[in-house]
Amino acid sequence: TLLNEEVSPAVEALESLDPDSLSPRQALEWIYRLKNMV
């Protein structure tokens, strides 16, 4: 079941992300950070 699976670090990062508060540069940095996690 889903409850027994570990949550991906990328998913955890996305859950804490507030896209409306990011500058375009910060958003780009997040994309690269998330890409490196998967």
UniProtKB/Swiss-Prot annotation:
<keyword id="KW-0234">DNA repair</keyword>
<keyword id="KW-0547">Nucleotide-binding</keyword>
<dbReference type="GO" id="GO:0003677">
    <property type="term" value="F:DNA binding"/>
</dbReference>
<keyword id="KW-0238">DNA-binding</keyword>
<comment type="function">
    <text>This protein is involved in the repair of mismatches in DNA. It is possible that it carries out the mismatch recognition step. This protein has a weak ATPase activity.</text>
</comment>
<comment type="similarity">
    <text>Belongs to the DNA mismatch repair MutS family.</text>
</comment>
<keyword id="KW-0067">ATP-binding</keyword>
<dbReference type="GO" id="GO:0005524">
    <property type="term" value="F:ATP binding"/>
</dbReference>
<dbReference type="GO" id="GO:0006281">
    <property type="term" value="P:DNA repair"/>
</dbReference>
<protein>
    <recommendedName>
        <fullName>DNA mismatch repair protein MutS</fullName>
    </recommendedName>
</protein>
<keyword id="KW-0227">DNA damage</keyword>
